[in-house]
């Protein structure tokens, strides 16, 4: 095993995911690829809205707030990943992608031997609810082994 894909979701959950991936990488002599994915279509969807003056402004502010929070979460998770990998002397790279998370991970996994993801906060960075079928969708897309 030489390459491990690590899902960097919410920074709060990233610590255990990164620690687990580092343990595996150390025993196998593997390189880690930390990936953070932003899905703008999910972050921009605000659901049904009332009609009225100022609704568009509030919606735009909500969208901007979500994007700002996601950027901060990704920065924290990437920093944590890099610091822990450096401290453990594990070779690593980071990757940030924008688009459908399931398509992106399915594409990246072709070049990896193992995937390590957390149970929570995989792609939505605690800003919008995580799809309840995330694991099923990853497996259906051919993301293995996890």
Predicted regions and their residues:
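Gly/Ser-rich helix-loop-strand patches that form or flank binding pockets
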Residues: 18-20, 102-146
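Small/aliphatic-rich secondary-structure junction motif
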Residues: 1-61, 141
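Structural beta-alpha unit
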Residues: 39-41, 68, 72-115
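Short amphipathic alpha-helical segments at helix-loop
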Residues: 6, 62-66, 97
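Generic structural signal for residues in well-ordered beta-strands
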Residues: 32, 92-94, 146
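Residue-level marker of alpha-helix boundaries and capping positions
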Residues: 8-12, 72, 96, 125-126
């Amino acid at each position: 095993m030489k390459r491990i894909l690590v899902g960097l979701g919410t920074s709060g959950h990233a610590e255990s995911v990164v620690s687990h991936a580092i343990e595996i990488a150390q025993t196998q002599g593997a390189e880690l690829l930390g990936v953070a994915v932003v899905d703008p279509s999910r972050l921009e969807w605000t659901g049904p809205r009332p009609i009225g003056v100022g609704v568009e402004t509030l919606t735009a502010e909500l969208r901007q707030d979500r994007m700002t929070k996601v950027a901060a979460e990704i920065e924290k998770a990437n920093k944590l990943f890099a610091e822990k990998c450096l401290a453990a002397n594990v070779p690593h790279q980071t990757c940030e992608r924008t688009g459908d998370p399931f398509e992106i991970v399915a594409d990246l996994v072709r070049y990896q031997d193992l995937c390590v993801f957390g149970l929570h906060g995989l792609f939505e960075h605690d800003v919008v609810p995580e799809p309840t079928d995330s694991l099923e969708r990853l497996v259906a897309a051919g993301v293995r082994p996890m």
